[in-house]
């Protein structure tokens, strides 16, 4: 099978702290890959390096067979949720996504309605995002990540703030993405989410990535 991401001997330091330690791993196309670990274990740093948000101090990363570099173009065809999504608080979810769609190639008002409904949000809701719950903002961030129909999704702590119904709904959305042949990298501190969804699992601890299954 084809690998969509190749991480090769990646190290990252913040001052004297060694946050990624010689990390190497391949992520196969069309699967849900889980990375489980406590807060501060290095999960988010690895995700940011894969997306090109952070530059590794050594090692290489390939996404869709293209090397990710600090001075190269942002990796294409990726939907990303890393940390709590930021939106304009005085605008509705639909209005926020319309602004983002104006900067993107594929997205339009029909796409916006579809992705909002997909994650369980009402596209006609007028409530400003500043009055959204954390779970609603997470859903909106997920909708944003889906707007350009990416083949690869990088999801970091996607279930934060969701109630039990929201968790079930978003799990089903993620399973549906796999059924469409998309690849998902899911980082979480919650072992239950990882076990429920993932085809492969790695554990991150003190910057060291270990294959669990």
What are these regions (language model features)?
Residues 51:
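Helix-to-loop junction immediately C-terminal to a conserved catalytic motif
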Residues 98, 109-124:
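Conserved ABC ATPase "signature" region
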Residues 36-38:
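The feature captures the beta-strand-to-loop junction immediately N-terminal to the Walker
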Residues 188-189:
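H-loop/switch region of ABC-family ATPase nucleotide-binding domains
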Residues 59-74:
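Conserved ABC transporter NBD signature motif
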Residues 153-157:
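Catalytic Walker B motif of ABC-type/P-loop ATPase nucleotide-binding domains
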